[in-house]
Amino acid sequence: MIEIDGSYGEGGGQVLRTSLSLAAITGEPIRIAGIRAGRKKPGLAAQHLTAVRAAGRICNAQLRGDALGSMLLEFIPGSAVQAGIYTFDVSKAQEGGSAGAIALVLQTILLPLALATGNSQVTLKGGTHVNFSPTVTYIEQVYLPILQRMGVEAQVKLGAWGWFPQGGGEIELQVIGGTQLGGINLLERGELQQVRGIAAVTELPSHIPQRMANRAENLLREAHLKVRVQTLREKGVAPGAGIFLTAEYQNSLTGFGGFGRLRLSAETVAEIACQQLLEFHYTGAAVDEHLADQLLLPATLASQESQYQVAEVSRHLITNAAVIEQFGLAQIRVNEADKIVSVKSLTS
């Protein structure tokens, strides 16, 4: 059984998600202690518990410690990953519901299902656009298109928007199985082609997305970027607002967002998203700090070496690399001076 220290590095949910994915793929039993020890509320929260149960369901795993707040988990796969039709609902993991991020559940099960025999259809319910996690827009416009270049064939369709704190969102994920993963080279991002944006609200007046869109377009044009922001006004279980920007370079993609909240003007929300995008743009890097650690797992499972240049070597990245190396599947080198990550499979 592989013993994993959940408190290692930044001690967050990434250790758990990576471990679950690799346990499902390899069939290796794992024990994780100190889960999310670095967080204010340690242990499994609703989205982590949903990820545990989703990963367990697809490989018929025996679970010990799968409860809210649990800091110790044993996960013993019972079979190879089974493709199929699944539904996972983050809001059912705790009483009173949850807006836990469904993108994090998606990222836990995507690669196991892509490598399985047969196609899968997964309905995920919970938070689609929430802080401190990838949004479904980021998954759709950045993460999946980059993974597609590595051989992953998957599509996500947004059925309903779910914001913090109510959630109530829903997506459908289609995954083609039997993937052979190839490496990726993202050392040069090339010229910026355009910035695409979505300014979206649910249960709020139409002037709010319009103001977010106008402010973002003005700011990015002042910085001499080509930009177009679409406005969306949708139905939802509760009011919510956000703007999500995707920058398309010749060879790479990145995305940033801003979320509305009480006493924060629509213009300020747009400024938050634009500031993040411009900060990344001026680094000249090919890969944003979030994608940097999300790419480690597919690169580990690929037949060729991968290399990519990151905007920042984050603790998340270093932590994730250390977890992956415990499974003995890949050698990961992080050149902190040049900010270049190299991943070479030890099994192919």
UniProtKB/Swiss-Prot annotation:
GO biological process: RNA processing
Top-rank EC class of the record's enzyme: ligase
EC number, as in UniProt: 6.5.1.4
Binding site for ATP: Q107, H290, L291, A292, D293, Q294
Active site: H316
GO MF, one annotated term: ATP binding
Record's keyword terms, sorted: ATP-binding, Cytoplasm, Ligase, Nucleotide-binding
Major localization listed first in the record, in broad terms: cytoplasm
Protein localization: Cytoplasm
GO cellular component terms, semicolon-separated: cytoplasm
PANTHER family given in the database record: RNA 3' TERMINAL PHOSPHATE CYCLASE, RNA 3'-TERMINAL PHOSPHATE CYCLASE
Name of the protein this chain belongs to: RNA 3'-terminal phosphate cyclase
Species, as recorded: Nostoc punctiforme (strain ATCC 29133 / PCC 73102)
Gene label: rtcA
